[in-house]
């Protein structure tokens, strides 16, 4: 996964963000929060550990977006949902024998995001909702037996479709719907088709949920992750979620290589498989990423390919450029074809911990009941990390 992607890729499951969460789940989340923090402080004292350390971090990431759906267009300022603005706190304690205990909180700031913007509703606003919560977990790590995580956070398959060395993930990666996911395709007569970019372009990557997760210690570059959990931030989803993933990471003399594959079960009627691989050539900066996924119950699938070049041409910082292609079948319904291509450039400004970026993407949908026009999206923006 793009590491800070919002990913942002979770689909709403029938609840308005301001509706009350079921009391049982609210209490469960609060109890987990208290347990996590007490564990991270209490066990530290019991284990004769070093003094615990706090780390505060965050980012602001805004872009100017121009969207043209073939019938109208608009330009607006929005939070970039490829990697939304956020803040986080880590409380970490080193225990004996290399063991480590960590409490991790992370939340979006609540700015209106690019994935929710439409041509009719795209004003930049600020309204925090509980769905902004990204991480609220306690993590216990050991050098030999791996890592155990409990609370709101990444499931085992989060990131399996998003392995990427390009350095352009802030402007485009395999979750290509994040730039303008709520934009609707229109017919040549100007009528809305009822199909949005979100519906026609998905990468089947995993999500963040309230879960128990185990990650094995790496062995010759390989690692295994498994998780079980449920959705507690959105009302109306009572399914149990189970995820299993295999990862591979190697840093070789000339190349860096990463691969991911994962299988996710959502209740008894839906399962998805997704995978990705990325290669980076150190001497030239050339890089490649490939991802694919399939929803087992519907047969919907896709393939994604990205080519990039990352070099330090100027003293300001590293420059990354990339081009990608996406092709999906049956994502918007049986017989539909979703195609997209995109360009991106990111310039790092090391002195100010900032990335300046620009990108363009074309979305094409064929095979629907009626012909629809392409949607074009362009963006320029900046991400500042602190």
Residue ranges and their predicted role:
Residues 45-54, 94-101, 144-145, 220-221, ...:
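Short loop/turn motifs that connect adjacent beta-strands in outer-membrane beta-barrel proteins
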Residues 54-62, 101-105, 148, 222-226, ...:
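Transmembrane beta-strands of outer-membrane beta-barrel proteins
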Residues 62-68, 107-111, 154-156, 228-232, ...:
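Transmembrane beta-strands of outer-membrane beta-barrel pores
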Residues 88-90, 137-140, 213-215, 245-247, ...:
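Outer-membrane beta-barrel architecture
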Residues 2-5, 9-14, 244, 374-386:
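Outer-membrane beta-barrel "beta-signal"
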Residues 48-66, 76-231, 238-240, 248:
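Outer membrane beta-barrel
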Residues 241-343, 348:
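Detector for outer-membrane/organellar transmembrane beta-barrel domains
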Residues 75-85, 131-134, 206-210, 238-242, ...:
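Residues that define the transmembrane beta-barrel architecture of outer-membrane proteins
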């Amino acid at each position: 996964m793009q590491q800070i992607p919002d990913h942002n890729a979770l689909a709403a499951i029938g609840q308005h963000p301001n509706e009350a969460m079921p009391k049982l789940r609210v209490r469960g989340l609060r109890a987990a929060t208290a347990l996590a923090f007490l564990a991270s402080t209490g066990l530290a004292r019991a284990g004769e550990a070093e003094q615990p350390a706090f780390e505060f971090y965050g980012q602001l990431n805004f872009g100017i977006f121009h969207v043209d759906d073939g019938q109208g267009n608009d330009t607006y300022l929005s939070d970039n949902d490829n990697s939304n603005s956020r803040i986080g706190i880590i409380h970490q304690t080193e225990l004996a024998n290399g063991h480590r205990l960590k409490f991790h909180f992370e939340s979006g700031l609540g700015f209106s995001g690019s994935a929710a913007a439409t041509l009719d509703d795209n004003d930049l606003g600020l309204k925090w909702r509980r769905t902004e919560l990204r991480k609220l977990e306690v993590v216990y790590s050991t050098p030999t037996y791996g890592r155990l995580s409990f609370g709101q956070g990444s499931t085992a398959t989060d990131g399996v479709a998003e392995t990427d060395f390009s350095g352009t993930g802030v402007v485009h990666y395999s979750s290509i719907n994040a730039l303008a996911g709520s934009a609707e395709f229109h017919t040549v007569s100007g009528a809305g088709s009822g199909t949005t970019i979100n519906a026609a372009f998905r990468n089947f990557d995993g999500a963040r949920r309230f879960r128990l997760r185990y990650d094995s210690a790496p062995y010759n570059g390989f690692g295994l992750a498994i998780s079980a959990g449920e959705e507690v931030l959105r009302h109306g989803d009572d399914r149990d979620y189970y995820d299993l993933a295999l990862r591979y990471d190697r840093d070789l003399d000339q190349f860096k290589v990463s691969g991911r594959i994962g299988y996710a079960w959502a209740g008894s009627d839906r399962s998805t498989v997704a995978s990705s691989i990325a290669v980076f050539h150190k001497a030239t900066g050339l890089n490649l990423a490939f991802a694919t996924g399939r929803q087992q119950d519907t047969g919907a699938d896709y393939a994604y390919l990205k080519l990039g070049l990352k070099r330090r041409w100027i003293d300001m910082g590293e420059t990354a450029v990339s081009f990608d292609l996406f092709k999906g079948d049956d994502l918007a319904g049986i017989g539909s074809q979703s195609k997209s291509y995109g360009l991106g450039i990111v310039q790092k400004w090391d002195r100010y911990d900032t990335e300046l970026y620009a990108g363009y993407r074309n979305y094409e949908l064929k095979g629907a009941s009626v012909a629809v026009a392409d949607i074009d999206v362009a963006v320029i923006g900046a991400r500042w990390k602190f």
